[in-house]
Amino acid sequence: MEDSRVYLDRSNATPSYIPVTPQIPVPGLGHRRVKREHVQVDEEPTVQILIKRPKVEDEEVPIPIFPPLPPARDPVAAVAAAGGQIVRRRRRRVPGTAMGVDTVDVVLPVGVRYHPSIEAARPPAVPPPRAVPPVGVRYHPSIEVARPPAARISPPRRRRRRRRSPRPRATAAYRSSAEVVERRRRVAQTVPVVRYHPSIQVEPAVHPPLAPRLPVQMAYTRYHPTIH
């Protein structure tokens, strides 16, 4: 007996469609040889009816209807009562979903700025008690009685003028040689006269006379005939 088994394609190539009828082989359209599970088989074309898969729609959930809030608790009415304004921005859609995000800005007029007081956070400062002498009582001179403190009166301050210090003189490194020589002469002239005791006899220093310098002729020197 000849084997007449038919291998059908169980893979779903179109996920958006679902089968209605089973696969019916059509032998008259030819066949092709393919490899299925390491076995060489002849694949014949089949016919099957498919329909579009219905979309899963969201179930309609009844939305509860809440009673309107009183004006005292209604935020929109509270903003309107305060003279404010509600600004609604453009709706933004969340990518990949059908949801949207609405942003609402509430603008309220600010007339009075609130500054918290430091005194509200700490108790009031109490000044320390002071001993005040009674009025009309005279004490012994040896007893010193402190007078009540009075406001200190400071004299008006005068504006001090800044005196410029004289410019420093140039150092010897920046002075010329003529200035240094002139200064040395001045120092030599201002030396005080020395007076000795009469018992001390000081003779003036005697320097030997300088011998006249004779002209020295260089050895092996030839002069011009005009020089005698």
Swiss-Prot record:
Chain spans, region Disordered: 146-177
GO molecular function terms listed in the Swiss-Prot or TrEMBL record: DNA binding
Species of origin: Murine adenovirus A serotype 1 (MAdV-1)
A Gene Ontology cellular-component term: host cell nucleolus
Biased segments, Low complexity type: 168-177
Family statement drawn from the similarity comment of this UniProt entry: Belongs to the adenoviridae core-capsid bridging protein family.
Localisation: Virion; Host nucleus, Host nucleolus
Listed GO biological process terms: viral release from host cell
Taxonomic superkingdom: Viruses
Keywords associated with the record: DNA-binding, Host nucleus, Late protein, Viral capsid assembly, Viral release from host cell, Virion
Reported induction: Expressed in the late phase of the viral replicative cycle.
Biological role stated in the UniProt entry: Associates loosely with the viral DNA to form an outer shell around the nucleoprotein-DNA complex and links it with the capsid by binding the endosome lysis protein. Dissociates from the viral genome during entry. Might be involved in nuclear capsid assembly of the viral particles through its association with NPM1/nucleophosmin.
Subunit composition and interactions: Monomer. Homodimer. Exists in equilibrium between monomers and dimers in solution. Interacts with the histone-like nucleoprotein; this interactions bridge the virus core to the capsid. Interacts with core protein X; this interactions bridge the virus core to the capsid. Interacts with the endosome lysis protein VI; this interactions bridge the virus core to the capsid. Interacts with the peripentonal hexons. Interacts with host NPM1; this interaction might play a role in virus assembly.
InterPro entries membership: Adeno_V
Disulphide bridges: none
Tagged with keyword DNA-binding: yes
Biased composition (Basic residues): 155-167
The name this protein goes by in its record: Core-capsid bridging protein
Further information: All late proteins expressed from the major late promoter are produced by alternative splicing and alternative polyadenylation of the same gene giving rise to non-overlapping ORFs. A leader sequence is present in the N-terminus of all these mRNAs and is recognized by the viral shutoff protein to provide expression although conventional translation via ribosome scanning from the cap has been shut off in the host cell. This protein is only encoded by mastadenoviruses, and may therefore play a role in mammals tropism.
Gene behind this protein: L2
Keyword DNA-binding attributed: yes
